[in-house]
């Protein structure tokens, strides 16, 4: 966005503040063999399970446009996709990118969990997935690749020198909070630029479909998504969650970003959305039937 394009944002641009100015979608990675075998893995990685591979295909199909530029999720094409550098998350981001017609993370990308966190890019649509080490799962140190702190055959832990030290709960939550703020700040700035560029106060930009607004997709892990939601959307916590906000593999949390001239607000629009998964790939809690997929229509916000 060049300086010549900047105009004061008229307060009338915010008259319908109930409509999000931008969307943020958090996606958990596909199921890995470690998930199946109940092996603790944070920064270590395991191959995807057969069900995880099927989830990726279903996720890719669900992101493919079905009408205009919307898809099964009734979401606009991402303006930017950012992924954790850990393999299971990268593969999940690739599925989303293929469905959306966006370039996957380049093979030349060398980002790992120990890399410096990436800087937020320019406020424009990006046609290639980016990696951010800040989206990595928590580092569990010597507990990596264990079940109840016991080694598990087939899950060899890298040498301590290579793996490094564990990340404390406090340090992990601070990282998730800081990285979350970075990306929400980026999205807010983009949303405000977008409102500026809509033109005069009597324009019909507020009535346009959601495919016209900025949409950031972050592909990460269960613990990271839990930490983000607890800190940025604490009302998301339900009694059934106990100490952890549950997220199924490849599920989506879609968040609306609302802006006024002096503030911003996040609103959870979709929670743990697995509408793309059929009953054979949507695991349910023991003794309970899986919840049916959500059918919230985001375009209703613009109707």
Which sequence ranges carry the predicted segments?
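GST superfamily/GST-like fold recognition
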Residues: 222-226, 251
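Active-site signature of alpha/beta-hydrolase-fold catalytic machinery across serine-
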Residues: 95, 227, 231
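Active-site-proximal alpha-helix that buttresses catalytic centers in soluble enzyme cores
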Residues: 2-9, 16-120, 171, 176
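Phosphate-handling substructures
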Residues: 34, 97-186, 302
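Active-site metal-binding loops of divalent metal-dependent hydrolases
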Residues: 30, 222, 274
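Beta-strand elements within well-structured catalytic alpha/beta cores of enzymes
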Residues: 23-27, 82, 210-220
């Amino acid at each position: 966005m060049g300086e010549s394009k900047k105009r004061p944002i008229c307060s009338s641009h915010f008259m319908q503040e109930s409509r999000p100015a931008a969307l943020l979608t958090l996606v958990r990675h596909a199921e890995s063999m470690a998930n199946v075998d109940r092996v603790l893995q944070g920064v270590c990685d395991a191959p995807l399970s057969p069900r995880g591979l099927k989830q990726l295909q279903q996720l890719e199909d669900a992101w493919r446009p079905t009408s205009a530029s919307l898809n099964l999720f009734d979401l606009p094409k991402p303006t930017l996709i950012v992924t954790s550098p850990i393999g299971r998350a990268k593969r999940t981001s690739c599925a989303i990118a293929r469905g959306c017609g966006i370039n996957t993370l380049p093979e030349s990308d060398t980002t790992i969990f120990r890399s410096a966190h990436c800087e937020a890019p320019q406020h424009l649509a990006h046609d290639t997935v980016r990696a951010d080490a800040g989206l990595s799962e928590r580092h569990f140190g010597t507990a990596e690749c264990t079940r109840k702190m016991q080694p598990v055959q087939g899950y060899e832990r890298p040498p301590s020198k290579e793996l490094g030290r564990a990340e404390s709960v406090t340090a992990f939550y601070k990282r998730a909070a800081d990285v979350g703020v970075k990306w929400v700040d980026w999205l807010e700035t983009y949303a405000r630029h977008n409102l500026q560029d809509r033109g005069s106060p009597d324009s019909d930009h507020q009535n346009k479909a959601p495919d016209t607004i900025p949409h950031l997709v972050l592909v990460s892990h269960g613990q990271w998504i839990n930490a983000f939601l607890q800190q940025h959307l604490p009302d998301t916590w339900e009694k059934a969650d106990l100490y952890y906000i549950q997220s199924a593999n490849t599920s989506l949390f879609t968040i609306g970003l609302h802006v006024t001239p002096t503030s911003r607000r996040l609103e959870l629009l979709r929670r743990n959305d697995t509408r793309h998964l059929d009953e054979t790939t949507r695991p349910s809690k023991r003794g309970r039937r899986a919840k049916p997929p959500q059918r919230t229509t985001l375009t209703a916000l613009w109707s």
